[in-house]
């Protein structure tokens, strides 16, 4: 079996909306890489999605990926809600446009290129890798605040 790539992702926002950042700690075996960035005007959910997108975009080949996020929004969106959104033309069950549909569609396309599983971790609870992703996201936000 392939050694999986772990992506520990997080988003941060100073105000919601406001300056925001995203962070990714990538781990493949004993190797690690850190990624982060931000935007001047965004939301926490957009940064959570962007973190996963940027992590997946950095992969150079198809692989097994375990995405560890503290965002129920991202995890539930990809595991539960997205199927209905796609079936309904990117509308919610209430027939409203899906928020952040641009990012959801990009994430959906990227996930399709890999063997992906999702793990939820409790945020701000001492999970070392999640704390590092949070620090990276805050560094990304600090560039714009």
UniProtKB/Swiss-Prot annotation:
Keyword Nuclease: yes
Keyword terms of this UniProt record: Cytoplasm, Endonuclease, Hydrolase, Magnesium, Metal-binding, Nuclease
RNase H type-1 domain sequence ranges: 1-142
One of the record's GO molecular function terms: magnesium ion binding
Pfam families for this protein: RNase_H
Gene Ontology cellular-component annotations: cytoplasm
Kinase is among the record's keywords: no
Reaction(s) the record says it catalyses: Endonucleolytic cleavage to 5'-phosphomonoester
EC number, as in UniProt: 3.1.26.4
Amino acids binding Mg(2+) 2: 10, 134
Subcellular localization: Cytoplasm
Binding of Mg(2+) 1, residues: 10, 48, 70
Xref: InterPro entries: RNase_H (IPR050092), RNaseH-like_sf (IPR012337), RNaseH_domain (IPR002156), RNaseH_sf (IPR036397), RNaseHI (IPR022892)
Cofactor note: Binds 1 Mg(2+) ion per subunit. May bind a second metal ion at a regulatory site, or after substrate binding.
Cofactor(s) in the UniProt record: Mg(2+)
GO BP: DNA replication, removal of RNA primer
Subunit text: Monomer.
Family matches, as HAMAP family: RNase_H
Family named by the database record: Belongs to the RNase H family.
PANTHER family: RIBONUCLEASE H1
Summary of the function given for this chain in its UniProt record: Endonuclease that specifically degrades the RNA of RNA-DNA hybrids.
Protein name: Ribonuclease H
Source organism of the structure: Neisseria gonorrhoeae (strain ATCC 700825 / FA 1090)
Gene: rnhA
């Amino acid at each position: 079996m392939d050694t999986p790539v772990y992506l520990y992702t997080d988003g941060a926002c100073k105000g919601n909306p406001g300056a925001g950042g995203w962070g990714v700690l990538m781990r493949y075996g004993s190797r690690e890489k850190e990624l982060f960035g931000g935007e001047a005007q965004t939301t926490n959910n957009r940064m959570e999605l962007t973190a996963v997108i940027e992590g997946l975009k950095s992969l150079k080949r198809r692989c097994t990926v375990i995405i560890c996020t503290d965002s129920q929004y991202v995890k539930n969106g990809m595991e539960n809600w997205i199927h209905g959104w796609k079936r309904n033309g990117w509308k919610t069950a209430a027939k409203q446009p899906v928020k952040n549909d641009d990012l959801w569609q990009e994430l959906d396309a990227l996930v399709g290129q890999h063997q992906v599983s999702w793990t939820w971790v409790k945020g701000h609870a001492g999970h070392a890798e999640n704390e590092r992703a949070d620090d990276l996201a805050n560094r990304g936000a600090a560039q714009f605040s």
